[in-house]
Amino acid sequence: MKSKLIAAVILAIIIAAFAASRFISFKQQKPVETVAPKPQVTIGIILPLSGREGAVGKGLQAAARLAIDDLPKHRLKNEYNFIFKDDEFEPKNTIAAFTRLQHADRANAVITYSAQSGSVINTLAENGKIIQFNVGSAEPAVAKGRYNFVHWTHPDESTREILDHFRRNGFQKVAVITPKISEALAAENAFRQNLPRYPEITAKYYRAKPQEKDFRMLLSFIRNYEPDVILALVSTSRASDIIFQYRASKLPYPLTNVASFGRLDTFAGGEDMFFSDVAPARQELIKRMLSSQPDISTFGAGNIYDAVMLLVEAFEDAPSPQQAVGALEAQRYYEGMAGRAEQDAEGVFHAPSVLKQIKNGRAEIEK
């Protein structure tokens, strides 16, 4: 009987000790810290990944992916989701891609390529309060409105570059060919505004239809004018046409261009021609792109890389994603893969311009 009593007392002591230890352990246990989820920011990137501008679009996509890979994700306050869309360089597809990004993906911003794409969604972006950051457009109207921005070489820089070339070579009479399209007219307007700085140079202007493919008649008129040099402000889609028709005409005056020759898939027929172009990306970015894809286009690579970085920086600096447009507006200068760019009052980040010459089938920067 006594042994049973002792056993019961020992069991009670053990149970009490176990309960006390559990209570103390519970009291000492730290509360579980809950980490608030990061705000979500979605950025759509609409590019021509197929179609006639597909080669350029794939190069831009590769540069954008490198920018995304380079983001210091562990230090960012927002969670970023990047969505690529192929518009095949067709305006209706650009609108459809933007609409899906706006309503299905709830995009906070989009990156677009070219004046064509930037123009067709300019109003949609403005009304939807979605930031559009365009690369590849020299048309100032693409940046119209508070929510529209451009990162590219402005016609003011590119036309001064070509005028400097004319001066160095003693070209005093210039024949300017301008199709009636907004981007070409903007380049001509910049050329006219810069011309007074070069009093020794005069120009005569020749208009072409918006989608003109046959420039032979204009070239015959130019032969009668006998200029020192021809400046063709044609679009990329018509650049090959005028190059081959110029060669066939055997005109003795050099053919030059602003920007569009740089977008050609091939420089066949353009040997020795000069053109001003957007400055290339820094060598470190170009080397990374070419290391995995030796034949990839690097056209505009620095611009789209910097557009990704500028957008992320704006969203990081803003108190909320909805206020990122104000942070982007406040960015006056940016030193990036495209060099030093300055933002003007219209939302255009002016990238540098360079002079290039076609040599051995490649466009090389003229030193």
Language-model segment annotations:
Residues 2-367:
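Extracytosolic ligand-binding ectodomains
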